[in-house]
Amino acid sequence: MENKKFEEKPSEGRRNFLQAGGMALLGLAMPEAISAKPRAAESLAMSGGPKAVHFPADKLEALTRWPRYGQAEKDALHRLIDTDMFYEELPLFEKEWQAYTGIPYLRAHINGSSAITSMLFAIDLEPGSEIMVPSYDFPTDVLAMRFFSYVPIFIDISPTTGTFDLEDARRKMTSRTRAVFPMHSWGMPCDMDHIRDFAKEKDLIVLEDAAHAHGASMQGKKMGTWGDLAIFSFQASKVLPTVEGGMGMYH
């Protein structure tokens, strides 16, 4: 009897059957994939395409304008100019900020960067000491360290809050680490209770960047009062703007 070889390719009838069966199964699992019509490509609005949101430009500018000053602020500025006593208001501001935060020692600065530099000077660490900072941070927190030969250790940020990730800090702790320097991104408080516990356990100084966190609090305790030292900024983009200014705070 003559031996016949099997065909390596399925017959046309079998191929059509398999294709039809596969499409039927795909249709059961993903009916929208079969029934959906292809969408026409659209250009982005910036490239001349249709806008997804329509909002009057004048209203948008009014809503997003910052900083905002009212008549009270304008009157206070006029009084300052008329009296020609430019520096008399500063001690009053320090006194009011001290009463608001409950911090015993503080000093106003020309800006937040100056307050940060003063804070890093005050801790008086040895050159080469490591300070943990979030990887998403304002440059001054790191740049000011170079004045004192401190070494920044960049800590990952939490994907849910955008703030200092304590678990990553635990992994990157070394024998040279001397301080942690968390920042409250966009005013979102870091987990300062856990950070303080970690710092106490490892004998670390807590430096708190509260530049964005005016008025924010956690567990009834204001941000800027959790650290051994802390700073605020009053730059024009901040929650409490004075065009420029900063505050250094010390327990």
Show where each model-derived region lies.
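C-terminal segment of N-terminal export signals and the immediately downstream linker at the start
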Residues: E32-Y87, K95, A99
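N-terminal export leaders
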Residues: E12-M30
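Conserved active-site segment immediately N-terminal to the catalytic lysine
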Residues: E208-T242, M247
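Conserved SAM-binding loop
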Residues: A108, V133, G248
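N-terminal secretory signal peptides
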Residues: M1-E12
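Phosphate-binding glycine-rich loop
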Residues: E89-E130, A144, F154, K221
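PLP-dependent aminotransferase-like
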Residues: A45, F121-A210, S217
